[in-house]
Amino acid sequence: MQSWPRRTSCRRNMDYADWELTINGTNLHWPEVTIDVLFTKAGKPFIVSAHWPGQTGLHTAMRFGGWSFQQNTRFHSLTTDVLYALLRHSDGFQFRSRRIMETTPDFETAVQKMYNTDMMAPQYFIMAGAKPYQGAVLSMDRGGRHLPGTPPLMRLGNASAGKRLGTSWYLVQTNDDMFEQPRDHRRPDQELRLSTATQSMVSTEWMWKEMLGLALYMEDTVFTSVYVPATGYHETLAHPGQFR
């Protein structure tokens, strides 16, 4: 996620393996069943979302003129997640994110609603708005808590992000906590690449080059999405050659 001089953009690689569906003797994997869904309201584009079969909530989406959203896995216990859902009535993120995106037009209100939600599982939410430096990474704990060891709400341009990254116009969130030891090479490699870049380089073409580069593109990358809420730019590229 990065801020342009006049807008903010968000991009993601969805990495997800170990699934296939056989239809008429043909094995289909995640990339072959990834589609771009356009929701309309009063005949006008409202929300765009990267979707999979049977999906009714949102994991990668943008509200036109408003804000974008993506969810990243934060490693956790599935058994505990189920217990929180059953006993505490904590929310699953897909339905909650759809409700908020449908009813909340502005970025700041959406960030606060997401951050204060009682979620059943730890995870990361990456959100970008239509204005410059409207970008945030929400490191979520289950049960509506914000634990001492969990990174605070990180924003583009804030001091805590700049202190760690040496800059304020971008944030990199993969599947591990900021300021902690990375679980894989993606975050440190991409931060190293960005340390040699300048904000004036940012464009949709530049974002695609970064997302498909060696630092972020993995063997199990299912699709890549780029969203710019201010302009309505959106594109999702599935990678059907993966998992073969």
What are the residue ranges of the model-derived segments?
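A contiguous strand-loop segment
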Residues: 1-92, 120-122, 222
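C-terminus-biased signal that marks the final domain/tail of proteins
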Residues: 1, 95, 101-244
